[in-house]
Amino acid sequence: TAPGAPAAVTAAPRAAAALPSPAASAAVGAPSAALPATTVRLPFASLGAFEPLRLRGADDARTINAGVRLDRVVTGARLRLTYAYSPSLVFPMSHLKVSVNGEVIATVPFDAAQAGRTVTQDIPIDPRYFSDFNQIGVRLIAHYTLDHCEDPANSALWADVSPTSELILDEAPVRLPNDLALLPAPFFDRRDNGLVRLPFVLPASADSATLRSAGVLASWFGALADYRHARFPVSSTLPSDDQAVVIGTAATLPAGLALPSVNGPLLAVADNPAAPGRKLLVVTGRTAAEVDDAVATLVLGRAALSGPAATVAHVDPGAPRKPYDAPRWLPVDRPIAFRELVSDPHALEVRGTAPDAIRLNLRVPADLHSWNGSGVPITLRYRYTAPTAQDNSTLAVEINDQLVKSYRLAPARAEDARGRLQLPLLSVPDGRVTSDVDIPAFRVGSGNQLQLRFTLDSQKTGLCSSTATEPQRAAVDPDSTIDFSHFVHYAQLPNLAYFANSGFPFTRFADLSQTAVVLPDRPTAQDLEAYLTMLGHMGEWTGFPALRVQLARAADVAALGGSKDLLVIDGASSSPLLAHWRAALPVAIGGPRGAGATRVAFSVDERWRNGVGRPDGGAHIEQSGPLATLAGFELPGSRGRSVVALTATEPGRLGELLDVFEKPGLVAQVQGDVAVVRAGTVDSLRVGEPYVVGFVPWYARVWTHAARHPVVLGAVGVVAGLLLALGAFSVLQRIAARRRGM
């Protein structure tokens, strides 16, 4: 905060009774005295504003979205606004206007003494303004001169709101009824943008069937969590301070649960006897098969659930999923219209001179391969407020914040002023500008964002010339398309970047029908947390529960016969399965040696570097201290089947490996076939032999090999041309001879 007294805040009149009352408490229950009130701090960065809110011009606004959980009610609120503003303003006429859900709650005047510095201001907010979903608006009203010739787009008109600004909410708990109709709340609440942490309560010695059912349920919660990510700590006892999921047969459930008689697959919401005010989601049945049916009913949404408990009938999970048909992935067999990429058509429209980019998320399979080097074609159709003369108005097309192409927007034509128009039908392209863009294939990964950034230059041409008060507008037509259909599915593995970003190759089938998860015979709580959390990530990446995942133990791997891709999770330093595969492993971790500090044997048998084989390379490293590794290799004895192993020197270190998947900066460092995690850092290596999966047509293989040798390709082209010419010459000679004979 800058020195000196902060500027005064002018607050709006106190909200009247007509303001929206807290929807959560009115709809589902009254505030609960069983749980203490809490204070929640929501930095703007956690609400999606990772960069400063840049307000430009005489009148510019930005909004931040914030939710209030269903089981909480706001009792007090304040906005801690951190901002800076131009020192060139006329301060009596310039200010920030703050609103909540469209209602102005305060104006923040600017002070000349604070200009150009960072200022922090606390703004009280009446809690009755808050509902389930809320928009916090900040609008800049700015002037730099008292002259009527002021340019509303002058560069002196600016203010920046820092992403460290906070919305601080005092919240009281709300007692929710035990009602299945509220699911997935309160175990997952879409109003909460934070990391989902949901404990699972499993029997002390859970069998494989129970663990498989728990994994399917975790993948469903992971799909719901999406970008928030989800962690699933495991215990055999009820948590004393949280909600939880309890899963198992009726005979293995914890004591003290208030449940009806179990006469079949049962879903129930009950109070947590160990934590007053908290809830339990109980998934049970008389047998493991009934537990599985209850899970399938819940994750598929095949039944309209209500009341505290419901006994469900057998559910058909449907046909197995086809390759590459994950709901969260784009279709790669046809062009995709932009309307399929947004939930609201208004997301394709912007207004103002320098609006935020139109952002379209594109998640595609990681093994898309462009055999001829061609890019991703986009047919882009857009409209905009045409400038009266050629200026600096542009449309920039970017992929993952990298510029692909920029278009200068053409000025208005003479016929645009005739005053007669026809409203275009959706199928009629008149009135739009169409451009074809080709995104380089090497810039497209499994998770991408396409950014369409309009810059609409000011129309002010002279010192005292007027401009339109209505801001410029631009829109991208929903029938613009992007097309991945000419790519083939082909990838060189192992590549842990594919796994860390999209779960490939396991997520090739959204229901994980070609995946087996291998756990130790006696898994620890950390092993099970890693198992459930990784299946949660699979659901996050695909948007579909892992209905057909198979759970196996080390002794079951041989019986699989190389028919599955394997995800191996073992936090012990001496895994018998990994020891059996030691010849194929790119990395081997030894356990503790001697007394005192842990001695870690880290063996790397380096066989590949920079595309060149090194059959005699190798290293053996010993160090003190724990670590965890992520390793990928081809399943020994199979053809194209993959193994990804999560291992550690001790079970507790698996948590550090799980932390990596929640931090984009660390995920970006996971590459190659070995990723070593220690002390919050990731070191990636490529040390093993590569193998390929997928299919490339014969003509593509010929072209790929030929393209590696351009001189040979040129010589072959010359020879082919000569042979073609000689053949044509011979044919023409025979034709001429026949004519002479006639």
Whereabouts are the PLM-identified features?
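N-terminal Sec signal peptide cleavage junction
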Residues: 1-3
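Solvent-exposed alpha-helical segments and adjacent loops
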Residues: 6-742
